[in-house]
């Protein structure tokens, strides 16, 4: 009986920990993460204070923070080839990182670090030098900056069969030296690295290539981490938020269900299906059942996105900034529909898969510059600064904890719905106008469309909609309008 009670206690403790790892630790009603891909720490700190906090963003996913190999031309993916756990990259050093985390936490913006637990750098001719000056010999699996040696890695092999669990989890993903997370020593180094970031005030981690590591090894590592640092405003006993990169199209040998009990999982099917719909390859009317009916994970387990730094570079159904009208419609739907833990992308311009972030002649990452409207102009795309996107972050905050209701569609690609009595969204992806009296579910009054403009000094700078005492308003979205979406909420009432 004593053994049974102890086993039950340990089981419940494990379940409690994994449940806690689904909590993003947001402030107030904020509930959207932005990925400031390849930004410098000093620029993120300023962005938290001057833009993200005033507009209600909840958190920032940052690029990998630990030392990486220096590759010719400085492609973005060099950040995913670590050679030590020293906190020095082209984004800045440890002091600058710590300053950024503190300043962002001070204004209610949580920081989530993209972490590389699966591997170290791939092969390199001779001695490689990292961004902190550390030398390594990746071809010999020698990384003295940790230190790691060959005994800390799985034997080298190539993934040739993605239906072979052994290959997926113990061979080398695109040639990257595959760490043995079952080793006590490797586990200790990974835990030490993550705990240091927790000490500096981060709220959690995006775990890169999670499906290439055994779930039981990750469970041990996550369960061994420290609680979040209360000196950065986290409650006592708060656990780091975990979201794991698991690409699962529904027929994978290693499935997302092996990981969703440990933390949230990146829902790639969401990205693919929302792209198909807003590219016109699937009628928007079918989105009424969006979510688990589409085979997605449950809402609290799914990290959702229109695109990410990887799949925005691939051909196919996924939308990116290069299709701005459809991209903004898809993002508006993403942030308005009550499903998932939402993340929006903030990119830099690219012409090919390997394009580096904006950099100067000395290959230093440059800071974003802004025009008079606040949009980025020097190679940074900054989708999060597009009015149509940051306005929907405010919409999502305004309607938090409300249900979807009053769905309407025209049987094709015009849809609308309410979020309780706090918000209304309409979308027109047809080649003809949407002109219709629709139920907005809002209290009577005049409302600004936050897509086409803003509420400033008691007046709308874009479209406005009069809502009658029954909650109905006349909605017009022309087929040739700049944006194919209209959004109203209670905080944009004149």
Swiss-Prot record:
GO molecular function annotations of the record: alpha-amylase activity; metal ion binding
InterPro entries noted in UniProt: A-amylase/branching_C (IPR006048), A-amylase_C (IPR031319), Alpha_amylase (IPR006046), Glyco_hydro_13_cat_dom (IPR006047), Glyco_hydro_b (IPR013780), Glycoside_hydrolase_SF (IPR017853)
Residues bound to chloride: 206, 308, 343
Active site annotation, chain numbering: 208 (nucleophile), 245 (proton donor)
Residues bound to Ca(2+): 118, 169, 178, 212
Signal sequence coordinates: 1-20
Cofactor mode of binding and number, as noted: Binds 1 Ca(2+) ion per subunit. Binds 1 Cl(-) ion per subunit.
Keyword Electron transport in record: no
GO CC list: extracellular region
Alphabetized SMART domains for the sequence: Aamy, Aamy_C
Gene Ontology biological process terms, A to Z: carbohydrate metabolic process
Disulphides: 48-104, 157-171, 376-382, 418-441, 448-460
Listed Gene3D superfamilies: Glycosidases, Golgi alpha-mannosidase II
Modified residues (Pyrrolidone carboxylic acid): 21
Family matches, as CDD domains: AmyAc_bac_euk_AmyA (cd11317)
Protein name according to UniProt: Alpha-amylase-related protein
Organism: Drosophila lini (Fruit fly)
UniProt gene name: Amyrel
